[in-house]
Every structure is written in C-alpha cells, then in structure tokens.
C-alpha cells in the first residue's frame, strides 16, 4: 500500500519525489524534513525563517510516525531563537515599487506589506522580467531565475542548517 491506494500507508518517502519534482516547470524550492517529534518545532521555525527572509515557498515534511510520536521537549525561550529579518521595502521605493525587483547584493525580492500606500502591485502567474515586471519569454531572463537558486545551498551552509544527502539537485 501507499498514498492514495486505499491501503494503509507505511513509512516511505514517495511524497519526497512529489515535493521535489511535482511542481510546474523548473521551480526549485527549499524542502525541510522534520526528523523526530522533538525536531518539529525547530524544523517549522527554520522553514518560516527561510520563507520570510527569502520570500520563497518552503515545504516542511513530516509523517504519521512523527505526528503520532511523542518525546520530552522543553519549550525554547523565544529570546534564544535566531531573529527573522524579512527583506522589507524601503522608503525610497515608495511609488516605484515592483514585486519583481531584487536586492542586487542578496538577490532576494523586497517584501511590501499589503495595503501600504505607495507599494500596491499586482501579481500574476506568467514569468516576468526581473526588473520591469513585464511578461517575458526571453531565454536570458529565464536563465536568471536559475542563477538565483544558488542561494539555497549558500544559505544552508552559512546558517548551520544540516543538509542530508547530495548537493547535486538531480540526486535524491
């Protein structure tokens, strides 16, 4: 048995392939897997930190074994947790903000809180030019999106996030 077969599920990693490769087109994203009931809080916190600091979707994987498990766990002191630094828009961007602009140094998009005057924008599902926000089908623009994905490996290695497995994105 397995997921969606009508049979009881067993411990397996079939969902991992779905998470890594089940998206439209070429759109890599960070995937974090909790390793134990005790690890769930840290994994969820780190997933939120990555999502908010890099404005990217992050998938957090758990399973029934972890969900039904239990272990002693001490609630962490919130002041001991690493700070989350969202990459917010600047006052200089007011009335000139587009959600496709990236910080030239970090390659992270700026985050405008919805409803702020001077930062209104419209999002769509088509690929946009990284500077203007106009619809783009140019190969160079598309290539630029893949160059940005390198931050995942750099971020994980700089922030002591354990990486299990190969650095090769084609290897599971």
Spans of features found by a protein language model:
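Flexible glycine/proline-rich, aromatic-decorated loop/lid segments
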Residues: 1-26
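Short coil/turn connectors at secondary-structure junctions
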Residues: 13-14, 25-29, 53-57, 171
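Flexible, low-complexity linker and terminal segments
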Residues: 43, 48-172
């Amino acid at each position: 048995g397995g997921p969606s077969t009508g049979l009881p599920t067993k411990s397996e990693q079939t969902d991992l392939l779905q998470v890594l490769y089940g998206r439209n087109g070429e759109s890599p994203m960070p995937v974090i897997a909790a390793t134990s009931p005790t690890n769930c809080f840290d994994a969820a916190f780190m997933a939120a930190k990555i999502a908010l600091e890099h404005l990217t979707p992050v998938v957090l994987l758990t399973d029934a074994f972890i969900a039904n498990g239990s272990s002693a766990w001490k609630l962490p002191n919130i002041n001991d947790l690493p700070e989350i630094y969202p990459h917010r828009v600047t006052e200089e961007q007011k009335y000139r903000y587009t959600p496709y602009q990236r910080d030239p140094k970090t390659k992270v998009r700026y985050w405008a809180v919805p409803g702020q005057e001077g930062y209104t924008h419209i999002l769509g599902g088509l690929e946009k030019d990284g500077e203007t926000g106009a619809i783009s089908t140019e190969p160079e623009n598309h290539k630029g999106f893949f160059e940005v994905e390198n931050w995942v490996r750099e971020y994980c290695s700089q922030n002591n996030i354990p990486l299990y497995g190969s650095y090769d994105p084609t290897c599971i």
